[in-house]
Structures are given as structure tokens and as C-alpha cells.
Amino acid sequence: MASERKELGKIQKCHFGQGGYQDACIGVTFTLGGDSWGVGDFWGAWAIERSDRAKWTEADRITQLGEMVMRLNSLLANAKVSTVDALQGIPVEVTFDGMALESWRVLKEVL
């Protein structure tokens, strides 16, 4: 059974644009890290043209993108910044389950 651990670090890089799986998505890419660790995270949806074989619909994509923008808006508010590029250097607490990223949050307590 994997063990949960928390690490303190910062948002080292972040950008809005193409990213995710083989850069086939549109959204926000984050690089989070500390003294001896680093991890990437991506919030977004497929940017490629939908095929008839896709297991998602245009409505699904629009919903995912809307949810991502609202999540990003909340992150900006918690970090007390107004742009994605201003997130760089913001302190975070990251939770891992074994080696897998489970979640992360802005350390509002130290801002």
C-alpha cells in the first residue's frame, strides 16, 4: 500500500497554451517543486478535432474548459495574483500518494 506524504515547494513554472498528452490539449501546465523533488500537473481539455470514435463530446470539452477556467480563477484568487505568469514562485503544499501526485494547494497562510 502506498503512503501519503506532503511536500512544501513553489510553482516553478506555469503557462497557458497547448500541453497535456503529446501537446494535444489546451489548458494550464504547472511545474511544482522543492529542494529535492519536482512534479508536473496539467489542467485542461483536448484541443484536437473530435472524431466520431471519440469517447467525449463537444459539450464535454466545453464543460471541462469552463471548469478549468473557474478552477484557475480560484487559484489566482488564493495566490492573490491576477495572471497565470504571476503564479511563478507562489508557495504550495503538494500531497503525494506514493510517487503519484494526489493534490496541491497554495499556501495562503504564508502569503
Where are the model-predicted features located?
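Short beta-rich binding modules
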Residues: 1-111
